[in-house]
């Protein structure tokens, strides 16, 4: 297996700052905004984006709000029988999502199936005004008509390659790597 680093800590930091600015511009501030990470690394990513948004808004207008939460999609996945996954994680919302713009956050967008499950889970929790998607890496190979609104890095890859996102909070370091020849 050959592993190569495609994003390092500084690259990830710049991408998250850009995504944060794009979310703020799209939403015209933090009013009515909820950022929900999909466990595990999507939650870390959502927290970082929310912290960045809070810093930007605090500097710009002195605004601050609790806007981040986690959305577990385990029981909404369509591949549970074929692919047993981790134990369900708690879902935590920053408040009611009705009428808000919800930004779903995940580390890698691949087939689109995780996001489809997230949309199903979200519909059981309320009726947002709009739903957007932010991902650190979009690697292509979609099986469903889903696209990200905010992307850190478009990283076309072969289906045989595996992309790993690592965050200091979970893995001890920040990096995005591609492992060639994995299935």
UniProtKB/Swiss-Prot annotation:
CDD domains: PRTases_typeI
Motif (PRPP-binding): 102-114
Record's catalysed reaction(s): UMP + diphosphate = 5-phospho-alpha-D-ribose 1-diphosphate + uracil
One of the GO BP terms on file: regulation of DNA-templated transcription
GO MF term list: uracil phosphoribosyltransferase activity
Keywords annotated in UniProt: Glycosyltransferase, Transcription, Transcription regulation, Transferase
Major enzyme class: transferase
Domain of life where this protein originates: Bacteria
One Pfam family named in its UniProt record: Pribosyltran
InterPro entries: PRibTrfase_dom (IPR000836), PRTase-like (IPR029057), PyrR (IPR023050), PyrR_bifunctional (IPR050137)
Cited HAMAP family: PyrR
Function: Regulates the transcription of the pyrimidine nucleotide (pyr) operon in response to exogenous pyrimidines.
NCBIfam families, sorted: PRK05205.1-3, PRK05205.1-5
Similarity comment text for this entry: Belongs to the purine/pyrimidine phosphoribosyltransferase family. PyrR subfamily.
Protein name, UniProt field: Bifunctional protein PyrR
Organism: Leifsonia xyli subsp. xyli (strain CTCB07)
Gene designation: pyrR
């Amino acid at each position: 297996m050959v592993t190569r680093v495609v994003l390092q800590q500084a690259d990830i930091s710049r991408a998250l700052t850009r995504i944060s600015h794009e979310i703020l511009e799209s939403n015209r501030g933090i009013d009515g905004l909820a950022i929900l990470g999909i466990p595990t690394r999507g939650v870390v990513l959502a927290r970082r984006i929310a912290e960045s948004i809070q810093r930007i808004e605090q500097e710009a207008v002195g605004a601050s709000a609790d806007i981040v939460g986690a959305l577990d999609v385990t029981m909404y996945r369509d591949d549970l029988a074929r692919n047993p996954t981790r134990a369900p994680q708690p879902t935590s919302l920053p408040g009611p999502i009705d009428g808000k713009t919800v930004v779903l956050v995940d580390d890698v967008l691949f087939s689109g199936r995780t996001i489809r499950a997230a949309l199903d889970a979200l519909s059981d929790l309320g009726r947002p005004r709009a739903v957007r998607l932010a991902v650190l890496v979009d690697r292509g190979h979609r099986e469903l008509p889903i696209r990200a609104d905010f992307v850190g890095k478009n990283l076309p890859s072969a289906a045989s390659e595996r992309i790993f996102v690592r965050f200091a909070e979970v893995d001890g370091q920040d990096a995005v790597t591609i492992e060639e020849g994995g299935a």
